[in-house]
Swiss-Prot record:
It comes from the Archaea. The lineage of its organism: Archaea, Methanobacteriati, Methanobacteriota, Stenosarchaea group, Methanomicrobia. Fe cation binds at H107, H111, Y128, D284. Keywords: Acyltransferase, Cytoplasm, Iron, Metal-binding, Transferase, tRNA processing. One of its GO terms (cellular component) is cytoplasm. Binds 1 Fe(2+) ion per subunit. This is tRNA N6-adenosine threonylcarbamoyltransferase. The gene is kae1.
Length: 324
């Protein structure tokens, strides 16, 4: 089966075709704001300008390879409403034109599914961290249950917020990681874990204040160590509670090598396995939407046109995972 997937929840517009074995074609066009963070309407305008040429290129690539597309998948949510609507409209038109099933995919679950596909993880506790989300999840009773999540802003949002406050370019995460490697000391910062949930807004504020008094490299290091320790603690608790012997890191912030190191060490100490997808599959990508659409279609799940409205606040635990 060949499925075309379209991702466009925020920054990255991407389209891909996959089958059960591999990614066949993938193309992307990324929105980069002139300054500051993401502007939803500007991002949607970017997507609307690029989605036609992007899809034509992917479809022509399929024709050149003699591939017949069996389904169209799209990111139905969560995400920025204007961006989601642009992608959903294109997906509906394409599914009708090709006369193939349409399937709306939960963006968060797509990160998990492509991670499992590409690493071989079977039943992991999942730390999902990105610019818009920070959650610890595990599959129980046919749904990806949220064991812990942010009480305010995501860890990716927190890193970008701090970066802007100290004049670092967007996206802030990679630059913070780079500066942290040259640190000489740890500066105590607020560590906020409440039960199974975490909070990052106070940490960002405290780090911005610390940057006025300490070397920026030390503040970046301390910010990373504190935030990531919070995430690792909750992931370990979820593994114990859900009795999982595997952990997997997904989402754009998961590309941070230090976070991967901390999770790997925790898993080694627990005698558990740690899985980390290739960097190309950590950020938002069309392949994850296409692959999740494929497993959904093979399990008998599709989305009627009349039910294909976008869901900006689509919760991970709302989805019945029939294919797992």
């Amino acid at each position: 089966m060949y499925v075309l997937g379209i991702e466009g929840t925020a920054w990255n517009l991407s389209a891909a075709i996959v089958n059960e074995d591999d990614v066949i074609i993938e193309r992307a066009a990324t929105y980069t704001p002139a300054r500051g963070g993401i502007h939803p309407r500007e991002a949607a305008q970017h997507h609307s300008e690029h989605i036609g040429p992007l899809l034509r290129e992917v479809i022509q690539g399929a024709r050149d390879l003699g591939i017949k597309i069996d389904g169209v998948a799209f990111s139905q949510g969560p995400g920025l409403g204007p961006c989601l609507r642009t992608v959903a409209t294109a997906a509906r038109v394409l599914a009708l034109k090709l006369n193939v099933p349409l399937v709306g995919v939960n963006h968060c679950i797509a990160h998990i599914e492509i991670g499992k596909w590409k690493t071989g993880a079977r039943d992991p506790a999942v730390l999902y961290v990105s610019g818009g989300n920070s959650q610890v999840l595990a599959l129980r009773r046919g749904r990806y249950r949220i064991f812990g999540e942010t009480l305010d802003i995501s860890v990716g949002n927190m890193l970008d917020k701090f970066a802007r406050s100290v004049g670092l370019p967007h996206p802030g995460g990679p630059r913070i990681e780079e500066l942290a490697r040259n640190a000489k000391e740890y500066i105590p910062l607020p560590y906020t874990v409440k039960g199974m949930d975490f909070s990052f807004s106070g940490l960002a504020t405290a780090a911005a204040e610390a940057a006025r008094r300490y070397d920026l490299e030390d503040v970046c290091y301390s910010l990373q160590e504190t935030a990531f320790a919070m995430l690792v603690e909750v992931t370990e608790r979820a593994m114990a509670h859900a009795e999982k012997k595997e952990a997997m890191l997904v989402g754009g912030v998961g590309a941070n090598r230090r976070l991967g190191e901390m999770l790997r060490l925790m898993c080694e100490e627990r005698g558990a396995r740690f899985y980390l997808p290739e960097r190309r599959f950590m950020g938002d990508n069309g392949s994850m939407i296409a692959y999740t659409g494929l497993v959904m279609l093979k399990s008998g799940v599709s989305t009627p046109i009349e039910s294909s409205g976008v869901r900006p606040n689509y919760r991970t635990d709302e989805v019945e995972v029939r294919w797992a």
